[in-house]
């Protein structure tokens, strides 16, 4: 089970677009590869309390594979078995980073935190970690040109569906 966290300064609409993009991408990927589809959901303060509780229970039972939420809403979540936390936006301070990383490895379990860091953000991110004495705990995984070429047709299909969805909503 994975949790993808968007920076709370970003709009709910941006997080919704991310959820739709992930859904459309995984549908295209699943069709092409005969893989079972992932169950991806958006956990938001826009949901009623009962809906949020139901969604968290489904995540705990393994019925939801990916949960997308903001920093702010993630603060109230205590899930015991989150294998990966993916920070879609780079945390701006160490407290937020520690909070995000803390969503994994609850109760002594193993978990990984992934931060998607753009080239222009690397210096700030490394400096923040270094100042906190945490840089040695970080592994860098550089994505090489062409690594995602096999996924590109599915991504383009997902983007086209996303554009179509948002043009219909206007």
Model-predicted regions and their roles:
Residues 6, 65-66, 112:
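Residue-level preference for the first positions of well-ordered beta-strands
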């Amino acid at each position: 089970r994975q949790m993808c966290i968007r920076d709370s300064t970003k709009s709910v609409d941006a997080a919704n677009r991310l959820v739709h993009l992930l859904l459309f991408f995984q549908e295209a990927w699943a069709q092409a590869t005969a893989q079972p589809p992932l169950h991806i959901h958006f956990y938001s303060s826009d949901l009623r309390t009962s809906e949020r509780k139901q969604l968290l229970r489904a995540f705990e039972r393994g019925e939801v594979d990916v949960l997308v939420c903001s920093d702010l809403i993630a603060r109230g979540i205590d899930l015991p078995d989150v294998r990966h936390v993916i920070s879609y936006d780079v945390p701006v301070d160490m407290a937020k980073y520690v909070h995000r990383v803390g969503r994994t490895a609850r109760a002594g379990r193993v978990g990984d935190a992934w931060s998607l860091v753009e080239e222009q953000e690397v210096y700030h991110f490394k400096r923040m970690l270094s100042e906190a004495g945490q840089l040695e705990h970080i592994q860098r995984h550089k994505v090489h040109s062409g690594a995602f070429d096999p996924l590109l047709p599915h991504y383009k299909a997902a983007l086209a569906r996303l554009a179509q969805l948002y043009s219909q909503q206007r």
